[in-house]
């Protein structure tokens, strides 16, 4: 990676404004952006040439820009075209399009380095998520003045939580089983290089220590926020729910590569696959790491929901979703000749108990975030009472 100091801007545009798009086009067409990337192993450096940039979406931490090469641009190298998804579709023959994501929150607030996100994508089965291209973590030497992560584009759109059907749940269960077919030795990030699990601590794993530390952040985040009365009992109840599964986490025998933030907004749908199911892929792997498979299962939704993130599901629907996932994991294990499922998946009762603890953890974290944003965001202000009410009901507390 070589960075020309002259390519680093002296003023950094807001990541969601047209000024950033203009700077992005300039950096791409000059080749400065490509030169700055730490390219993922097996990926080719994106070609230099004319490109159109458009804001594809804004999430809780990142703004995503779509880069569409213009027709005069030479075709991208084969390694950079979008991989064929497991849907029977053919990969595009023309230039690939790309998604470049830039954080609109402080880098210190991100759960992982961007290089670790790219490493996780490189470790995932082909077609589960976007093909990784590369990242640049250092804002001071970035041609945009911001950290960047670049992947191939993924077709499709997120479905509204209220529009999910049983077919969506089955497709998601099968796709998630493919992601979780990658084993991990414990809870921790995926590292670049030849030893992807080098940062996973040895010995018994823990979740409670992480949640206890997060709880201090939740309390700090909502100080002075409007309409946050009653959050302290929710925090205590969430901690108690996690404490009950700590012995399971310490003895768990089947950690996997986990997406870590697999809510509805990070699940894209595009037509149907060869089996006639809705075709699905995942995006935004910034939380990806080795973890308990129950985490991704819980993040979809269930009884605790609100906003665009969580799918409201009955107990019967959750049971069907989990059953489809377990069956898909078993089928993949048979195909691979790897024998029986680990108890972390085969013991469905224990899996469901851990899902309930992960639900308490994840929704409490989101509730604290939503409460901290409610004063400045009408959407977060609207979501706050529903998310708080459904979490309180799940934890057996009055709203």
Spans of model-derived segments:
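Active-site activation/catalytic loop segments of kinase-like enzymes and analogous catalytic loops
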Residues: 294-337, 359-377
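Active-site acidic catalytic loop and adjacent metal/ATP-binding pocket
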Residues: 56-69, 99-100, 240-295
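Helical subdomain adjoining the active site within ATP-dependent kinase catalytic cores
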Residues: 340-343, 365-399
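Intrinsically disordered, low-complexity terminal tails and inter-domain linkers enriched
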Residues: 34-49, 70-96, 272-277, 330-347
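An alpha-helical support segment within catalytic cores of ATP-dependent transferases
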Residues: 16-46, 182-260, 270-273, 347
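Hydrophobic alpha-helical segments that form the core
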Residues: 197-200, 204, 355-368
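ATP-binding pocket architecture of kinase catalytic cores
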Residues: 54-84, 89-202
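Actinobacteria-biased recognition of intrinsically disordered, low-complexity terminal regions
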Residues: 1-18, 74-92, 399
């Amino acid at each position: 990676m070589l960075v020309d100091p002259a390519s680093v801007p002296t003023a950094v545009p807001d990541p969601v404004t047209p000024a950033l798009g203009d700077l992005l086009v300039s950096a791409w067409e000059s080749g400065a952006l490509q030169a700055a990337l730490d390219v993922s192993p097996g990926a080719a450096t994106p070609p230099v040439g004319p490109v159109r940039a458009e804001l594809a979406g804004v999430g809780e931490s990142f703004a995503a820009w779509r880069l569409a090469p213009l027709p005069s641009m030479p075709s991208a190298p084969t390694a950079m075209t979008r991989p064929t998804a497991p849907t029977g579709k053919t990969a595009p023959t023309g230039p690939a399009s790309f998604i470049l994501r830039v954080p609109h929150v402080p880098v210190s607030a991100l759960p992982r380095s961007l290089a670790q996100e790219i490493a996780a994508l490189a470790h995932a089965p082909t077609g589960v998520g976007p093909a990784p291209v590369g990242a640049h973590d250092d804002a001071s030497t970035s041609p945009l003045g911001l950290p960047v992560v670049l992947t191939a584009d993924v077709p499709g759109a997120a479905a509204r939580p209220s529009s999910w059907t049983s077919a969506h749940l089955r497709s998601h269960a099968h796709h998630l089983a493919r992601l979780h077919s990658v084993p991990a030795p414990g809870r921790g990030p995926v590292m670049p290089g030849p030893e992807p699990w080098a940062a996973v601590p040895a010995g018994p794993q823990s979740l409670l220590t992480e949640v206890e530390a997060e709880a201090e952040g939740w309390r700090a985040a909502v100080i002075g926020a409007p309409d946050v009365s009653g959050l302290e009992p929710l925090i205590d109840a969430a901690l108690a729910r996690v404490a009950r599964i700590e012995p399971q986490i310490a003895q768990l025998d089947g950690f996997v590569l986990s997406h870590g933030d697999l809510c509805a907004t990070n699940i894209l749908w595009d037509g149907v696959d060869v089996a006639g199911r809705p075709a699905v892929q995942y995006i935004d792997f910034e939380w990806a790491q080795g973890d308990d498979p129950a985490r991704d299962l819980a993040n979809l939704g269930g009884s605790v929901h609100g906003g665009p993130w969580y799918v409201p599901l009955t107990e019967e629907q959750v049971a069907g979703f989990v059953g489809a996932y377990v069956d898909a994991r078993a089928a993949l294990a048979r195909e691979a000749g790897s024998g029986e499922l680990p108890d972390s998946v085969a013991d469905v009762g224990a899996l469901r108990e851990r899902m309930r603890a992960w639900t308490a953890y994840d929704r409490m974290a989101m509730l604290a975030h939503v409460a901290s944003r409610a004063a400045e965001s009408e959407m977060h202000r609207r979501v706050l009472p529903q998310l708080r009410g459904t979490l309180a009901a799940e934890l057996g507390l009055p709203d």
